[in-house]
Amino acid sequence: MSALALELKKEGNFVSGSDLKPTELTKKLESQGITVYYGHRRSNLRSADFVIANGAINEDNPEIKEANLRGIKIKTRAELLGEVSRRYKNIIAVSGAHGKTTTTEMIAEIFIHAGKKPTVHIGGISKYFNSNLLLGKKKLFITEACEYKNSFLSLNPTTSVILNIEREHLDFFKTFANVKKSFEKFEEKSKICVKLDKKRNIAYTKKLCVEGKNISHLGSGKYGYDAFCNNKYLGKIYLNAIGKHNVLNSLCAICVSLIYKIPFNKISEALLNFKGVKRRYEIVSENPLVVCDYAHHPTEIKKMILSTKRFTKNKIIVAFQPHTYSRTKTLLHEFLSALRLADEVHIIKTYSARESFDFDGSAKHLSELLKNSYYHSSMNSAYKKIKERLTGKETLLILGAGNIDELAEMFSG
């Protein structure tokens, strides 16, 4: 949402918005001349011509009520993203249950390094351009494409990427079959679709097949491999990103780059010097090693723990903040299986987002079902207990999509 607000502001529009409390993003918006109100009130609308609401906002929101009362046009974030994207000649949209932000960033860094000057919308703060928005020329728009509430169907991609499909957002989709149908529609709307075959380590379209062979661990959780396209050897890739799953993300980024005729040397250079995104395996402290990541789905948590175990023999402590009661309840057994890979777990009160309390999907219930687990009702209590448990022989993974980055900030000092 903030990236769209910034783009509209830079186009000369008066933009205001509201959030519950100040964050790094809201402070940045204010520094760019955007008015930010803290708390949701009818008076915040003032003389707005239209209102943009994200997926977490419901009809009971006082600003939505006021907009309806005054007949002000209400658009979803997805609708606005679709409108903005259509101003560009080419649209690259990256979808999937996991890896969207990192893969979008890989594509963006490659295209920028190759001098393509894209406009980029990303679901995190890029370490390459220090924002979630980069404004370029009107030829190329690179964005994440989220499936929640069929949001990505507002886009008409020139090139789409489908990284993976999982049982996610079932509070909206209800069944996995509906999730798959939504992705099928997204693929149909795309002129070219890049998909993954993770068993064969290939990213492919109808005309291209990019394969990673001779994958090897280079140390510190990073990987290298030989890249091929349509069975022709391209060269070596040395990937500056932790985790074997990022090999698959990079194959998709390479495939997209080749579609747009980017030379392989530019691709390999960009991936060698890949900067990444904040809260994506972000190391916030070296001693002890503390890592912050957006992982909030069992598959992502599992990858984080296993990737870390690949390069350290330290005890693994996980601090995890569940994101929504419905996700935790629906995937409870998967969460338990993933978290049991850690040596010790600290579960922090659920980030409920748009939902009402449900004990069966709560952080407390999740914690009660785990051994070597501690439940915390606040970030401060979590920090004190974890700090007490650290001896210098542990690696701490701070995971979640809510405000658990506040805990990471406590350890970064």
Task: Describe the residue ranges of each PLM region.
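Short acidic low-complexity segments
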Residues: 35-47, 378-386
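Phosphate-binding loop of NTP-binding sites
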Residues: 7-13, 30-31, 43-46, 55, ...
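C-terminal helical cap/extension that packs against the catalytic core
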Residues: 336-394
